[in-house]
Amino acid sequence: MRHGKAGRKLNRTASHRKAMFANMAASLITHEQIVTTLPKAKEIRPIVEKLVTLGKRGDLHARRQAISQIRDAAVVSKLFDTIATRYATRNGGYLRIMKAGFRQGDNAAMAVVEFVDRDTFAKGAADKARVAAEEQAVAA
């Protein structure tokens, strides 16, 4: 019997789940919005909300705990510098999950996960910067 077993397996091994959630959390912090399946969205929400709470603590131990989960120093610095200061007065509820229909190929339920007061220019900012740099290089 499966009594008291919290969380979804998502048809993956434990190490695959851990790596997938670390990558999804890093993408969500970087772009401030991701599109994924509904079960993955429901699983990633408490992970990222706990990371934002770590960012609000702001001490060295909290930063090291965040790095142990995300494993990307640039993402952790954005979490602690930008996102934690944005939600300094909010107690939880940093993320929103919106249902986004069904995927064409396998009819899986899709969802959009985003920060509540997100920066609308954060999504695709790296691509926009890369394209602008390429255009300047071509023009020069």
UniProtKB/Swiss-Prot annotation:
The keyword Ribosomal protein applies. Keywords: Ribonucleoprotein, Ribosomal protein. GO terms for molecular function: structural constituent of ribosome. PROSITE patterns: RIBOSOMAL_L17. GO terms for biological process: translation. The keyword Hydrolase does not apply. One of its GO terms (cellular component) is cytosolic large ribosomal subunit. It comes from the Bacteria. Part of the 50S ribosomal subunit. Contacts protein L32. Belongs to the bacterial ribosomal protein bL17 family. This is Large ribosomal subunit protein bL17. It comes from Rhizobium leguminosarum bv. trifolii (strain WSM2304).
